[in-house]
Regions:
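Basic, amphipathic alpha-helical patches used to engage nucleic acids or provide basic targeting signals
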Residues: 1, 23-94
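Solvent-exposed, charged helical/coil patches
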Residues: 1-19, 64, 92-103
Length: 103
């Protein structure tokens, strides 16, 4: 876990953003940095070692499994952690308000 991932984890663990996230979650053959199953939201922390093609394939797969995706750079987490946490909280609320009702 990178320093940025650890900082983000401390900020979101235990329903701090309105949802329960787990870290290093296997979803299919990928591992999400952080994932919530209610609502279905994956958070990825990017560094310079990630390849664009790999990121694109991961995003496509997670979305095909019904997850929304948020991506933050290590730099953004380091410089703007409160804003990152606010964005996550807003997405949790948005997904819950707009998910389809069961038939």
């Amino acid at each position: 876990m990178t320093i940025s991932e650890a900082r983000l984890w401390r900020a979101i663990q235990g329903r701090a953003v309105g949802a329960r996230f787990r870290r290093q979650v296997p979803i299919g053959h990928w591992i999400a940095d952080f994932a919530s199953f209610d609502p279905r939201l994956v958070i990825e922390v990017d560094d310079t070692s990630h390849e664009f093609r790999d990121e694109s394939m991961r995003t496509e797969y997670f979305e095909s499994q019904g997850f929304s995706m948020l991506r933050f750079s290590n730099m953004r987490i380091a410089m703007e952690l409160p804003e990152v946490v606010g964005t996550i909280e807003a997405w949790v609320e948005y997904i819950r308000l707009h998910r389809e009702a069961p038939e």
